[in-house]
From Swiss-Prot:
Residues 33-61 are annotated as: Disordered linker. Belongs to the Wnt family. It comes from Sceloporus occidentalis. One of its GO terms (biological process) is canonical Wnt signaling pathway. It is found in: Secreted, Extracellular space, Extracellular matrix; Secreted. InterPro entries: Wnt, Wnt7, Wnt_C. A lipid is attached at residue 1 (O-palmitoleoyl serine). This is Protein Wnt-7b. The keyword Glycoprotein applies.
């Protein structure tokens, strides 16, 4: 009875879009932390959640940050960011040059220009 059964197992990654959704959720729930340098008894340096009277450490699965990201929509001379105010945008684009994205949801003004010139046409 020379019967043989072969079983092959493998693991696969989730779809790229699923990973993107998970990362976006983690980004939206990111926790600001601060570095605590312990000096007593040679304890190691660690991170704790940055809140008043909080001594809680972040979970290993938390996405953490130390400094808040600058708001690139607003002008900030200290970082050299000119912001987006007054910039031209593409009203129909869904990309980074689109008005909805570039103006950070604050709305935008549209202008229509008419130019009249002499074309020197001969009939």
């Amino acid at each position: 009875s020379g019967s043989c059964t072969t079983k092959t197992c493998w693991t696969t990654l989730p779809k790229f879009r699923e990973i993107g959704y998970i990362l976006k959720e983690k980004y939206n729930a990111a926790v600001q932390v601060e570095v605590v340098r312990a000096s007593r008894l040679r304890q190691p340096t660690f991170l704790k959640i940055k809140q008043i009277r909080s001594y809680q450490k972040p979970m290993e699965t938390d996405l953490v940050y130390i400094d808040k990201s600058p708001n690139y929509c607003e002008e900030d001379a200290s970082t050299g960011s000119v912001g987006t105010q007054g910039r031209l945008c593409n009203r129909t684009s869904l990309s980074a040059d689109g008005c909805d994205m570039m103006c950070c949801g604050r709305g935008y003004n549209t202008h229509q220009y008419t130019k009249v010139w002499q074309c020197n046409c001969k009939f």
